[in-house]
Amino acid sequence: MGHEVDSVLPGLFRRTYGCGRPAISPVITGYSRIVNGEEAVPHSWSWQVSLQDQTGFHFCGGSLINENWVVTAAHCNVKNYHRVVLGEHDRSSNSEGVQVMTVGQVFKHPRYNGFTINNDILLVKLATPATLNMRVSPVCLAETDDVFEGGMKCVTSGWGLTRYNAADTPALLQQAALPLLTNEQCKKFWGNKISDLMICAGAAGASSCMGDSGGPLVCQKAGSWTLVGIVSWGSGTCTPTMPGVYARVTELRAWVDQTIAAN
């Protein structure tokens, strides 16, 4: 496994799984839509989380950012009785060896606004640390000063609806490659709903859809997959000609760091 570090300093690392470098490599063919997406290589988005209620109903996605913390959208409204499922690919299978984690604490961004959907970010501290392995490893977080240009191809993943009127969400994890838009371009579709706390992607025949909320939009930075957006909102009919809107991680990174440091 080229991405595992066998440290020359015994005990310092003990085979760490670095961020943004899944042990099982993703394969992206259609750079297409989750609405028009494709099935992901099983476990290749190793930070992908399924947030589920007590009945096992999947209501939002999320991303593992280290063994103790998951990031998702504030509008997912995670509660202490919800479950965090790691290492899942096929939600209809019981044979995957998933990790079902208990929520320890929930931190919603204090300036989350459900009307403007600004600051749509929430952190979950797991009650016990996740076990990092071939199928479960963290995503890198975009830095405050990172720049991800319009036109850059990035990928979103989730178990969201593959058609807006579908009866049920897909069992198998889906992915879609989407181009980033500049906020100027995005405002051509969404007008003044778009703030600096948001980043847009899509409008090229692909879109994130309901049920993918809270899940990742990742871009490659220096060979590592980096969390650039958190699925936030978009068209109610998941129109592939309208861009999806994501919470902009570069603008929210400082709050993430402060919250993790204090808890």
Swiss-Prot record:
Domain of life: Eukaryota
Substrates-to-products reaction catalysed: Preferential cleavage: Tyr-|-Xaa, Trp-|-Xaa, Phe-|-Xaa, Leu-|-Xaa
Ranges of residues in domain Peptidase S1: 34-261
Keywords, sorted A to Z: Digestion, Disulfide bond, Hydrolase, Protease, Secreted, Serine protease, Signal, Zymogen
EC number: 3.4.21.1
Cysteine disulfide partners in this protein: 19-140, 60-76, 154-219, 186-200, 209-238
Keyword Protease assigned: yes
PROSITE patterns registered for this protein in UniProt: TRYPSIN_DOM, TRYPSIN_HIS, TRYPSIN_SER
A Pfam family recorded for this sequence: Trypsin
Matches recorded under InterPro entries: Peptidase_S1_PA (IPR009003), Peptidase_S1_PA_chymotrypsin (IPR043504), Peptidase_S1A (IPR001314), Trypsin_dom (IPR001254), TRYPSIN_HIS (IPR018114), TRYPSIN_SER (IPR033116)
Chief localisation class: secreted
GO cellular component: extracellular region
GO biological process terms, semicolon-separated: digestion; proteolysis
Compartments (UniProt record): Secreted, Extracellular space
Signal peptide, first to last residue: 1-18
Active site per database record: 75, 120, 213
GO molecular function annotation: serine-type endopeptidase activity
Family stated for the protein in its record: Belongs to the peptidase S1 family.
UniProt name for this protein: Chymotrypsin A
